[in-house]
Regions:
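Conserved beta-strand scaffold positions in the cores of enzyme catalytic domains, especially
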Residues: 28, 45, 62-64, 108-110
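Residues at the C-termini of beta-strands that transition into short coil/loop
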Residues: 32, 49, 66-68, 112
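Extracytoplasmic/periplasmic/luminal assembly and interaction segments
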Residues: 52-86
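Catalytic cysteine-centered active loop of the rhodanese-like fold, especially the PTP/DSP P-loop
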Residues: 71, 77-119
Length: 119
């Protein structure tokens, strides 16, 4: 019985850690790097925070598609263009990048630190 408990604990730890790791093939960039990309025309800037968070404060040029709606609204994005994802801390945008990757998107970039690191 003790072995089963340890196996369960180890599996839970692995799943938890895996949830926080960036998806393979997703670029991680700083807020400094994204400031240069905001001016480019061939990128899609997506803020995955809630509509209320976005309404209270957002970066010009970013479109709001909340994480909870990314699967339903992914058709609004062009798979051929780079998708740059932003949230408050980088956690939700990381999850969004994993969801979009599963949906076949390959040009994905996550903003490390999100809005919290924006200056």
């Amino acid at each position: 019985m003790d072995i089963l408990k340890w196996v369960i604990v180890v599996v839970l730890i692995i799943l938890t850690v895996r949830n926080f790791l960036p998806a393979k093939g997703v670029k991680q960039i700083s807020n400094t790097e994204v400031k240069m990309l905001v001016k480019k025309k061939d990128v899609q800037l997506i803020d995955v925070r809630s509509a209320l968070e976005y309404e209270l404060n957002h970066i010009e040029g970013f479109q709001n598609i909340p994480l909870s709606k990314i699967k339903k609204r992914h058709h609004e994005l062009d798979r051929e263009k780079e998708v740059i994802l932003l949230c408050q801390s980088g956690m939700r945008s990381n999850k969004a990048s994993k969801r979009l990757k599963r949906l076949g998107f390959t040009k994905l970039t996550n903003v490390k630190g999100g809005m919290s690191s924006w200056s």
